[in-house]
């Protein structure tokens, strides 16, 4: 798929690949995948409770994906899901703010009609595209217990029993940076699944080790090899992202 990436840093939502923007690129995926990109600083609330019955109320568990690299603010809007009361501004709004310079993410108290949201809620905040391996959690300014773990390349922090009036602050280490792509691992995984001879796989693997991250050399060598356009393109995507 040919895409245009505006200026900035972009993250693939599903596989975690990190791209620098300001250019067009060809992105390669399997038949079961599509590229979905989030910009640095993106704040994306989600829930797994999507059945017909679930959507009649607001969820007591929310996952919030937060991407590293830039400041951003998001306001989560919720209403009663059934009536037209929202036309009279009968709603609940939860501000969420990422202060990347301070390495801090905040979920502020619910504004508006707090009765529209659960009396307590569990937030699972997933930090994507960051080098952080740990975090501290504060509820109303007091350090709180939270489950912190790495999950599928994300740093996941679960904060339970959050009341509508609570302020949740998650602080990452000061030295947290935007993560870097593991080019070798991604390229070797691609080769593992490529339908080519083992000799060709070995040649490409040796080239990757020999070039030691030198993009221009890798690109030139790949162009000179007798590879399919798709395989060459997929390798170049990983190398030049």
Where are these regions (language model features)?
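Catalytic core of carbohydrate-active enzymes
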Residues: 1-134, 140, 165
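A surface-exposed beta-strand-loop module
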Residues: 147-169
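Weak global preference for isoleucine
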Residues: 18, 34, 43-44, 50, ...
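Mature N-terminal, pre-catalytic/accessory segment of carbohydrate-active enzymes
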Residues: 164-165, 172-241
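Short, surface-exposed loop motifs enriched in S/T, G, D/E and P with embedded aromatic residues
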Residues: 96, 144-149
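Sequence-structural signature of mature extracellular/luminal beta-sheet repeat domains
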Residues: 142-144, 235
């Amino acid at each position: 798929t040919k895409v245009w990436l505006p200026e900035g840093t972009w993250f693939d939502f599903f596989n975690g690949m990190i791209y620098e923007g300001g250019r067009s690129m060809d992105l390669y995926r399997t038949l079961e995948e599509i590229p979905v990109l989030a910009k640095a600083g993106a704040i994306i609330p989600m829930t797994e409770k999507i059945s017909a019955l679930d959507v009649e109320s607001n969820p007591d568990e929310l996952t919030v994906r937060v991407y590293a690299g830039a400041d951003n603010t998001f306001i989560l809007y919720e209403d009663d899901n059934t009536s037209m009361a929202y036309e009279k501004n009968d709603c609940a709004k939860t501000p969420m703010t990422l202060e990347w310079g301070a390495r801090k993410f905040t979920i502020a108290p619910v504004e508006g009609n707090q009765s529209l949201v659960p009396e307590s809620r569990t937030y699972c905040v997933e930090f994507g595209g960051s080098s952080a391996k740990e975090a501290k959690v504060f509820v109303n300014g007091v350090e709180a217990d939270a489950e912190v773990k790495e999950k599928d390349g994300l740093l996941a922090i679960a904060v339970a029993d959050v009341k509508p009036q609570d302020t949740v602050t998650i602080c990452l280490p000061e030295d947290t940076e935007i993560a870097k792509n593991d080019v070798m691992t991604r390229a070797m995984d691609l080769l593992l699944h490529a339908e080519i001879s083992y000799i060709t796989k070995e040649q490409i693997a040796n080239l990757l080790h020999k070039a030691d991250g030198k993009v221009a050399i890798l690109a030139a060598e790949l162009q000179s090899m007798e590879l399919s356009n798709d395989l060459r393109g997929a390798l170049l995507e990983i190398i030049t992202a």
